[in-house]
From Swiss-Prot:
One of its GO terms (cellular component) is plasma membrane. Residues 1-8 are cytoplasmic. Pfam families: CcmE. GO terms for biological process: cytochrome complex assembly. Its main location: membrane. This is Cytochrome c-type biogenesis protein CcmE. The keyword Metal-binding applies. It is a single-pass type II membrane protein. It comes from Shewanella frigidimarina (strain NCIMB 400). GO terms for molecular function: heme binding; metal ion binding. Residues 147-161 have a biased composition (Basic and acidic residues). It is found in: Cell inner membrane.
């Protein structure tokens, strides 16, 4: 092989190796920032279609209703513990060490994002409460078996206001 071909081959191999390294680093970064959505039932029994269960230490989002009577507050700190359930009968216990949203209350729908510390227990870094009685995020509504419909507005009624 002459020196010119050898130089081209070395350059091509280096270029392919560089592209592969960048692609693998990109995939690793995207995978570590991925937050999968689960219902409480899916955390303990696995996804309905695939059977995949979240691993301990994995960052996930959990959506469901706050169980009435399950909220425990620490009087000396912001630490709160509560249970979240769904219509399939699953329950997950959530701990949170920050201010809860103003709309947060027992019996309301929430989405908690955090790390699964053990099976059935989530250490939340963020808790989101739904906006009003009628709104529910589409993924929570689908997971809980309810229909999520967009409100229809009458143009004449809007003009009369």
């Amino acid at each position: 092989m002459n020196p010119r071909r050898k130089k081209r081959l070395t350059l091509a191999v280096a270029l392919i190796a560089g592209v592969a390294a960048v692609a693998s680093l990109l995939l690793y970064a995207l995978n570590s920032n991925l937050n999968l959505f689960y219902t409480p039932y899916e955390i303990t029994h696995g996804k309905n279609d695939t059977g995949v269960m979240p691993e301990v230490g994995q960052r996930i989002r959990v959506g469901g209703m706050v169980t009435i009577g399950s909220m425990k507050r620490d009087p000396d700190s912001l630490h709160v513990e509560f249970a979240v359930h769904d219509s399939a009968g699953g329950t997950v216990f959530v701990t949170y060490d920050d201010l809860l949203p103003d709309l947060f209350r027992e019996g309301q729908g929430i989405v908690a994002q955090g790390v699964l510390v053990e099976s059935g227990k989530l250490e939340a870094t963020e808790v989101l409460a739904k906006h009003d009685e009628n709104y529910m995020p589409p993924e929570v509504a689908e997971a809980m078996g309810q229909t999520h419909e967009k409100p229809t507005y009458n143009q004449k009624a809007l003009e009369d206001k």
